[in-house]
């Protein structure tokens, strides 16, 4: 009887191990970085140079500076997912 319980316990443990979700690839993982917004308290003006960044909110911002403005205005923790458009 003890052997049978041991086999059942091992089978259940194996099912739990096999059933774990494993990321398919590192590409699917999203890494973000904090924008540099310290200068925004001194002068909140952004240049008109188009240097887009993709925010964690899924919005493409014209520049990192514009993303900083959105962070301040909306009081949200928007970070940069990647340089370029979303």
From Swiss-Prot:
Task: Enumerate the Pfam families for this protein.
Answer: Kazal_1 (PF00050)
Instruction: Spell out the GO cellular component terms annotated for this protein, sorted alphabetically and separated by semicolons.
Output: extracellular region
Which residues are listed under the site Reactive bond homolog? 48-49
* SS bond partners: 37-68, 46-65, 54-86
UniProt keyword Signal, yes or no = yes
**Positions of the Kazal-like domain:** 31-86
Report if keyword Signal is assigned.
yes
Q: Which SMART domains match?
A: KAZAL
**Residues making up the signal peptide according to the UniProt record:** 1-26
UniProt-listed InterPro entries: Kazal_dom, Kazal_dom_sf, Spink4-like
What is the reported tissue distribution?
Answer: Synthesized in duodenal goblet cells and in monocytes in bone marrow and blood.
Species of origin reads: Sus scrofa
Q: What is the protein name for this chain?
A: Serine protease inhibitor Kazal-type 4
Function according to Swiss-Prot or TrEMBL: Inhibits the glucose-induced insulin secretion from perfused pancreas; also plays a role in the immune system. Does not inhibit trypsin.
Q: Which GO terms describe its molecular function?
A: serine-type endopeptidase inhibitor activity
């Amino acid at each position: 009887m003890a052997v049978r319980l041991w086999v059942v316990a091992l089978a259940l443990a194996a099912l739990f191990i096999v059933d774990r979700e494993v990321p398919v690839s590192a590409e699917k993982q999203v890494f973000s970085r904090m924008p540099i917004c310290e200068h925004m308290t001194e002068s909140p003006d952004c240049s008109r140079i188009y240097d887009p960044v993709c925010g964690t909110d899924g919005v493409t911002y014209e520049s990192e500076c514009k993303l900083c403005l959105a962070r301040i205005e909306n009081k949200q923790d928007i970070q940069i997912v990647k340089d370029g458009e979303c």
